[in-house]
């Protein structure tokens, strides 16, 4: 069942709501929507609204706190067994067709401070991070009962995209200056983007694209979270909370 932003916010902040929400967490795996379409599925079936799950329609403000620019993504090699591509960061990615749905990087652009400084401009703030008409689109969505959402890159996930899991985990100990500079850059850009937006319209929900899970537990310990990740999260979260964003911070698995 579709619920509006007021109902969602009432529920998520422990207000009055007649029943628990029933949601599907992640949706179809990569590649399934295309397969289902070929089999005749409707768009409502593909986005799962046809099956009785609760959902709130979200509007992500058209502003970009992520990497902006970079290389043109190209296919380097396509064989029956795998696909090799080059992404916007310059990484070589390999997708094994028989056993994977997400390509894995074979190399990474950041190994030390000099290599980070070469791509750092892709993460710094500029007015070009705002799509024309972003405010009008957000106001229209709000008037239709949509949840107004902001996103920030993950405090672990984005550095791991730049460095890889192993190199990042070593760098926390061997090159903390590098990690602090990456986090400060991400934090400054996210803060300035959502500072400008929240002066014009209230954000309902701040989400973070995070992934620090390993097979046996977190890939990062509490000491590293306290030093590197927590200050980054709080920089934007405290801003939005002071501007009226309710106590909602995380991912929105039920939103479409």
Question: Residues of each region from the PLM?
Answer:
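N-terminal catalytic or cofactor-binding beta/alpha core of small enzyme domains
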Residues: 56, 78-81
